[in-house]
Amino acid sequence: MNPHSAATTFKPRFPLMKKFSLYLMIALYVLAGANHFYNTHFYEAIMPAYIGYHQLLIYVSGVCEIILGLLLIPNYTRKIAAVLISIMLIVFLWLHIQMLIDFWKNNDKHLWIAIVRIPVQFVLIWWAYSFARIPVSKGIK
């Protein structure tokens, strides 16, 4: 393998921006996860009726978000955390689609939030995955 290949010479184009982006993502998932414990009623309202154990699933997803957010901190766990966050967001996408359908059927005044949330979810998936593509040995300086 060429020692000067892209995999061995990775350098973020904007290292300060990438670092800020990482810290922002860590804060986002830790705070969002904590919010699952403080505002459970918000999450219960958007959970599909056909899924049971709403309270338990809200707490479990909150714990997952906190743990995955914290796993973004060490360089050696960042890649797997980013991949798992991407997968988690893909799983959550179907909940947001169901919320959109329910809001549409019920002519909910918050339909616009459900509409905006879908493309935002794709941005969040891309954002998380962008940290999965950084070679672990290089990290973010």
Where are the language model's segments positioned?
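Membrane-interface extramembranous regions
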Residues: 2-141
